[in-house]
A protein has these predicted regions:
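Immediate flanking context of iron-sulfur cluster ligation sites
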Residues: 175-196
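ATP-dependent adenylation/nucleotidyltransferase module used to activate substrates
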Residues: 1-178
Length: 221
């Protein structure tokens, strides 16, 4: 176990919850940071994040990034159009890109980590994100890792432990770590239940199927 502390960028979804428990296993201490940026599903995912962190007794800070919802354009945001239904791929999900979202969040997380004396920031991106979101790709992670390391004088490093894993592999790891997936939230629509039709719901279903795990999610359809 690493004797240092880690800060996990935590949305309350499958990947970041697995990252949270992975960090708890790998580091002496772990905290979570969540961001409210005006997404349609922010209220649902942050409610999930709160429940999960309270259950695990992990400290969590919530930081508002209201300017994103006010000035940026994306169907993921409350100010944007409808969330596309269907496959989780580049063509279908292009409208859900929020410009440089992860860069903004990671910059804030890195500053918070340095100020708190933490040695690492952890992001739970995976291979399925690469084609859709430029700020989830390995080259972006490498660039941000260099920027964070340089900008904090080597005090903070960026870790992306799942960057070369599929969501199904993450689900399998999460099950090994004891993740209660029934508490996690994925759906971009942010209604009472997972819609079951948007790309993230489709990807969620596929991940459980790939991992050979029962899907505990309650879907609308």
């Amino acid at each position: 176990m690493n004797s240092q502390y880690a800060l996990v960028v935590f949305s309350g979804g499958m990947d970041s919850t697995t990252a949270l428990l992975w960090a708890r296993r790998e580091f002496s201490g772990v905290s979570a940071v969540s961001f409210f940026y005006g997404a349609k599903h922010n209220a649902r995912e942050l409610a999930a994040a709160n429940v999960i962190c309270r259950k695990l007794n992990i400290p969590r800070l919530e930081i508002p990034l209201d300017f994103i919802g006010k000035y940026f354009h994306s169907s993921l945001l409350k100010t944007g159009g409808a969330i596309p239904e269907g496959a989780y791929n580049e063509t279908n999900m292009a409208s859900t890109v929020v410009p440089f979202r992860n860069g903004i969040m990671l910059a804030a997380a890195a500053g918070l980590a340095e100020d708190s004396g933490y040695s690492a920031v952890i992001l739970g991106n995976h291979t399925g994100d690469h084609a859709i979101y430029p700020d989830c790709r390995p080259e972006f992670i490498d660039g941000m890792a260099r920027a964070i390391g340089t900008g904090t004088g080597g005090k903070v490093k960026l870790l992306s432990p799942f960057c070369n894993m599929t969501k199904g592999q993450i689900a399998a790891l999460g099950a090994e770590l004891g993740v209660d997936f029934s508490l996690t939230w994925s759906c971009y629509n942010g209604r009472e239940k997972h819609c079951g039709k948007c790309g993230t719901c489709r990807e969620r279903r596929d991940a459980f199927r790939e991992a050979g795990l029962p899907d505990p999610t309650v879907y609308e359809d």
